[in-house]
């Protein structure tokens, strides 16, 4: 509405007709003569008229004149004329706004080339910015934006233009008449970073489309496996169903192991293993190896261990490799290397049993490697295996794979003894008995370590006997002769955890 004032000031006098212009309202006083003025248009009224009407009243002549003019206009001008004037003025304003909107949105529809032609230097702009229009003209001020306000830019919607095309387009769009230069708007140039970003995005999009298109032959090859999505979905559902059933059977087997029904447990493990479940295959191998719920058959146990090991089950890899290495000497070198490779995979996955077994294995021929033995002893000891800590102490005492260090050896023995390892406790007693018997080279080394006295050592060992301890592999030679894992010379009372505990603990992991 604020733009209507300037438009109506010029449209209203022209639309009311020539007879209305220059006429002043008729005075209401009866004794004053009527005067006319043909020089002043509405809404200004001539107040220099004779008569006693103007001198007798103490009113503002300007306010009185406007009021009389309004009454005269209401009396002599029909309402239709005023309505037409307002309507035509409103239509003119709407037409100018519509032209301006069309002028702004034309580049969006026409594209980059049309955007150059439909720029701010259009015929409408050149017409309104010509020299014969006053700079403060109401029509020009209301239609064209002010120089302080930047020209509207739709950078997010317009096509980006190349930097080489901009100067030429701008030079063509500028008018040649020098008189138009003072009235032209200073259009802010678009930042080159915006163009660089949009061009980079467009290039990236085009490269991505080109990469997706690719050679026609490769695209057809990629589409071939996706020809039967329904069959693939059905197969996936069947596999999920089989896996769910296998998990349920394996769970039932572990529950029957807890209750002591080994026959039913082995039956459930067998059903789950037939569906390819690696944990159930490992449990079947345990039952066959120890003869729980089925006659003992080591060859079948090795077969099921192998099936689970192929699927990446670390415990199955360890037991399968251990069974191969414990077999008679008829095993070929490729099979032996394969067993060692499986042990390394299980040890690298963090399995403590495999790390301890490899440490013992690398102390024997034909796999003798003292440095690797120390490495795997240290890994297993870091994971809490007391027997590997004891073996690491032997390496420090004898200088196997490491520099001989009696102080570190005693540290390892003490840590292993604190975890309840009986061979480590016996070794510590032997060392301190030698120290108490008389000075020797060994005693000098022990004194430098500042070891505790025998009384305090006995008290310490008595308190440590009740601590929890981890099972270990023991000596490899004893393991091959006895066939049981976790026993060692000097510790006959220590045994491997029961099968029931192994199944419950390992049935899901």
Swiss-Prot record:
Pfam families found in the cross-reference section: Sel1
Entry similarity comment: Belongs to the DELE1 family.
UniProt keyword list: Apoptosis, Cytoplasm, DNA damage, Membrane, Mitochondrion, Mitochondrion inner membrane, Mitochondrion outer membrane, Repeat, TPR repeat, Transit peptide, Ubl conjugation
A Gene Ontology cellular-component term: cytosol
GO molecular function (one): protein serine/threonine kinase activator activity
Record protein name field: DAP3-binding cell death enhancer 1
Motif window: SIFI-degron: 307-326
Entry annotated with the keyword Disulfide bond: no
């Amino acid at each position: 509405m604020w733009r209507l004032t300037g438009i109506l000031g010029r449209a209203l006098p022209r639309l009311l007709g020539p007879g209305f212009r220059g006429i002043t309202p008729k005075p209401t006083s009866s004794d004053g003569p009527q005067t006319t003025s043909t020089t002043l248009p509405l809404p200004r009224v001539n107040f220099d008229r004779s008569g006693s009407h103007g001198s007798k009243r103490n009113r503002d002549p300007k306010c009185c004149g406007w009021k009389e003019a309004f009454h005269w206009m209401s009396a002599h001008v029909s309402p239709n004329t005023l309505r037409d004037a307002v309507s035509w003025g409103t239509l003119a304003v709407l037409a100018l706004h519509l032209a301006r909107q069309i002028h702004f949105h034309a580049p969006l529809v026409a594209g980059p080339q049309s955007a150059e032609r439909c720029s701010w230097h259009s015929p409408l702009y050149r017409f309104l910015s010509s020299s014969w229009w006053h700079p403060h003209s109401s029509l020009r001020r209301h239609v064209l934006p002010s120089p302080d306000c930047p020209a509207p830019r739709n950078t997010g919607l317009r096509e980006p233009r190349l930097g080489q095309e901009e100067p030429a387009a701008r030079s063509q769009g500028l008018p040649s008449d020098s008189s138009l230069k003072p009235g032209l708007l200073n259009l802010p140039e678009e930042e080159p970073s915006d163009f660089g970003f949009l061009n980079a995005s467009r290039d990236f999009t085009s490269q991505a489309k080109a990469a997706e298109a690719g050679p026609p032959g490769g695209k057809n090859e990629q589409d071939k496996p996706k020809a039967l999505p329904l069959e693939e979905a059905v197969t996936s559902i069947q596999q999920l169903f089989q896996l769910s059933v296998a998990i349920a059977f394996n769970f039932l087997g572990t529950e029957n192991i807890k209750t002591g029904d080994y026959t039913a447990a082995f039956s459930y493990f067998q059903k789950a293993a037939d569906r390819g479940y690696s944990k159930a295959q490992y449990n079947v191998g345990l039952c066959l190896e120890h003869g729980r719920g089925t006659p003992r058959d080591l060859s079948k146990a090795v077969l099921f261990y192998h099936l689970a090991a192929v699927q990446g089950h670390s415990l199955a890899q360890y037991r399968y490799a251990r069974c191969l290495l414990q077999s008679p000497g008829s095993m070929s070198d490729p099979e032996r290397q394969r067993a060692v490779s499986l042990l390394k995979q299980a040890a690298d996955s963090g399995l403590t049993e495999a790390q301890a077994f490899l440490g013992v294995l690398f102390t024997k021929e034909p796999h003798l490697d003292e440095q690797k033995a120390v490495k795997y002893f240290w890994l297993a000891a870091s994971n809490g295996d007391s027997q590997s800590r004891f073996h690491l102490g032997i390496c420090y005492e004898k200088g196997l794979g490491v520099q001989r260090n009696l102080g570190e050896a005693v540290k390892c023995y003490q840590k292993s003894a604190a975890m309840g390892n009986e061979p480590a406790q016996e070794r510590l007693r032997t060392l301190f008995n030698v120290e108490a018997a008389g000075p020797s080279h060994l005693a000098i080394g022990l004194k430098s370590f500042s070891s505790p006295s025998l009384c305090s050592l006995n008290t310490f060992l008595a308190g440590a006997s009740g601590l929890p301890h981890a099972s270990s592999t023991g000596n490899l030679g004893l393991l091959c002769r006895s066939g049981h894992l976790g026993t060692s010379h000097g510790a006959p009372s220590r045994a491997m955890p029961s099968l029931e505990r192994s199944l419950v603990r390992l049935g899901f992991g």
